[in-house]
């Protein structure tokens, strides 16, 4: 494995689940909880307009002092994703070198980069994806050292 040839496409999650800005926060919460993802690209007609994270949603949730689950759901159903999403998030492309994307990710606060082609979301690469790459690289290096 040649480190300088590894690209985002080699480790990204292709065709991630997305949400629309007008959808309610409750929809994003449901997707994140049911699918076990931590970030959702926000799109209009396939074009990236934002990113919503599990942390954004937790900060936006009504207080635990909300009288009932019904009140909680009502607030989350009435609030659009656009109200809390990260607008114009930093992105990368599938053919970007993995090391370059990692450097970009270090300068963001949301733990993932949407992968775009012509403004359309084609994937997402997260800290976990970079960790998977690191494990593979280290295992290969360890194997080469033992040869």
What residue ranges belong to the model's regions?
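The conserved cystathionine-beta-synthase
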Residues: 19-36, 43-44, 91-109, 116
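Short, charge-rich amphipathic segments
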Residues: 33-41, 60-63, 67
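A glycine-centered beta-loop-beta connector
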Residues: 32, 40-56, 105, 113-128
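Short, surface-exposed, polar/charged, turn-prone segments marking secondary-structure boundaries
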Residues: 39, 46-47, 68-71, 78-80, ...
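A contiguous, well-structured "functional interface" segment within a domain
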Residues: 1-36, 40, 80
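Tandem CBS (Bateman) regulatory domains
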Residues: 1-15, 53-90, 97, 102-106, ...
